[in-house]
Amino acid sequence: MKAILAIFTGFFWRVITAVALCFIALFGLFFQRPQVTAIVEKNGSLAGVDALGRQTTSAGKSDKQVGLFYFVWAWDTGGPYDNTKIVAADPGATDSEEAWIAAGGGPLYNFHFWGEPLFGYYVNTDDWVYRKHCQMLTDAGVDFLVFDATNAYIYENALAVMLPVWYEYHIAGWDVPKLSFYTNTESGRTMNEIYDAYYNNAALQALYPRLDELWYRWPDSGKPFIVGDAGDPVLRPEVRDYFRIRRNQWPNFSKEKDGFPWMEFDRHMTLNAVYGRRGRGSVMNVSGSQHNDTVRMSSTAWYGGNDRTRAWHGKANDPDPLALLGGANFTEQWDFIRKLDPDVVFITGFNEWVAQRQPAHPGEPIVFVDSADTLCSRDTEPSAGILGDNYYMQMVDEIRKFKNGMDKQAPGLEVYYDYENDIADRDARGFGNTPYQDFSGRNDITRMTVRREGAKFILTVETRDALVAGPNWMTLFINANGTASGWEGYDYVVGRETPGLVERSAGDWEWAPVGMADITIEDSMITLEIPRAMLGDVIGFQFKWADNYIPGDVYSFYTSGDAAPMGRLNFRYSEACE
């Protein structure tokens, strides 16, 4: 920056210096790390409605920080074995080893899924999945990921696939979650290996010259952050000096002074669940469920244990299905966290789909520790099962509430951006060598605008390359009132079957024509002129552009073609912005 500023004198020097100082003052004090202009900030807060009708708004910029425990240990061990499906098909499957195997379960130490991910039973080298995760977690307002290296593996095969995706979007200006690690077993050796493989790797640095900008830095030191045992005699001095090391904190161990918790048992929802001094990087954990009673989620799933499931609240597990679907346990913890107002919240977790089958416990022939089935699991990633994207959307909204994020657009905002190169093909193998292919990417949406001229709204959408025609082509979805009315919250759709045709929701995937908008199509841009009266004379709305989606399937906004923004989230427009 100094070299750049040196070429300016007089007026220009003063202007640029003032801008730089303002930028640092506003955004840099808490992080104490290099900053890049983040495109996602230009989009303001996103909003949407989940399957339960709950309204969601994403966070704006804040000094508060949110980290996410991120798991990359899913490599193919056969199957796929899906515990929820196995027991649903044969309730006696957990009676014995023989019954388990006969019902389609896997042997000891094999990975078993607690349920089916929305993206399929993927493995940790599927770059298509990482591309989705990068968008979802950036949109959610997650500030940093913590890779689970607690079992002394550093997952170089997985990160060799993930890092290029993260780096691509970081360089493009997106404020992607920064990266860090959590060690426990053989902590010193593991931290040494992590340092050598990622932080002090000349070959990696040559491939990604700005890689240092991707490492999460703890606020009180500005050093790259890692969780581990700084007193481990195996830890090399240069590694100890390089990192800001916070102590690995297990939920069933005594509280460490500088601990970093990944879950709480006895300290759950008490003042003892805060680690560190407020204003100095204090941190609390929130998780989808806790295996506090038996330390075996399978015990509560199948054998009468009383671990805190997803449906736990008010000191008991609630049998009401809405407690499970609505994340009662998750909600209760977030409510408590906001009362104590720490600087950092660490969420457990995301993409923790698998657990290894463990040796039998007396009276419990089939044992899993961290996750067992839909109820007794803690993942916030969207599921192909009954949870759908409820927990992801809830996480987005809870992050916004914790950060006291913006509920409305920034003044003058009428330009919106989407991630480029998010229509890449998928041709991968998952667990059990299951093939996963997706070639639905067609038009890569990049930039959108909205403005009002007199009695009409003018919307544009641009794509990276010339527009390609086809079914379910470049459709505009509008939520006119911010509620769950219409189809999945969308009250109007434009261009669903005929370019320019405005239709109003008649319930489910049924639509009634309202009129024709003027439409201009040229090369890589579409312009719509929609009379405001066709949209009920609204002064603001939420909207999404989607191409090559699956009609009537809201989850195809995650999985098919291109949706801007992704999933159920929408951009927000208000005349007050102009």
Spans of model-derived segments:
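N-terminal Sec-pathway targeting helices
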Residues: 2-18
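Glycan-processing catalytic domains of CAZymes
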Residues: 33-416, 513, 530, 536-538, ...
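Acidic/polar low-complexity flexible segments
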Residues: 409-418, 477-497, 523, 533-578
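Low-complexity, acidic Ser/Thr/Pro/Gly-rich terminal tails and inter-domain linkers that flank the onset
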Residues: 430-456
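Beta-strand-rich interaction surfaces with strong enrichment in secreted/lumenal proteins
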Residues: 446-450, 514-519
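Short, well-ordered beta-strand segments enriched in hydrophobic/aromatic residues
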Residues: 455-465, 526-531
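Beta-strand acidic-aromatic groove motif in beta-rich domains, primarily in extracellular
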Residues: 469-478
